Amino acid sequence: MSNDLNFYINGEWVKSESNELIDVINPATEEVIGQVTAGTKEDIDKAVSAALEAFSTFQQTTKEQRIELLNNIISEYENRYDDFVQIITKEMGAPIWLSEAAQAKTGIKNIHETLDALKDYEFERPEGDYTLIKEPIGVIGMITPWNWPMNQITTKVSAALA
């Protein structure tokens, strides 16, 4: 059984303001496969505050730096691919073939597609007498469904980082 009881906020693992635990249940076996801590408004506020602080420097990153970041994420994803398949299988109660083909593979594909789009994207271009500059707008919040975890997370996170 896995217990992931801390949150990753501001570059470190921190305890929640809550002591409430939520069981993670494999819907195919109804076995409790782990626990996570129930987050609180205070936990969200800490995460948003850290994200806003980080954004002040992240918004200054170059296209090349963001390309490198996405390449690093792809490399780490590929290194942990089999782990993702196993975790998705347990969390969703899905057959391994489905976790691999429809979940883990879709996640890495999403990041690759975002990387390809980023490489070709024009953040600055002349428009008549002026120059149009597209820049990051700020911190985002994401809610993802349980039934497409890697697809939704990778789509949203990779686009936000690009």
For the regions a language model picked out, list residue spans one by one.
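Conserved small-residue-rich beta-alpha loop and adjacent elements
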Residues: 123-162
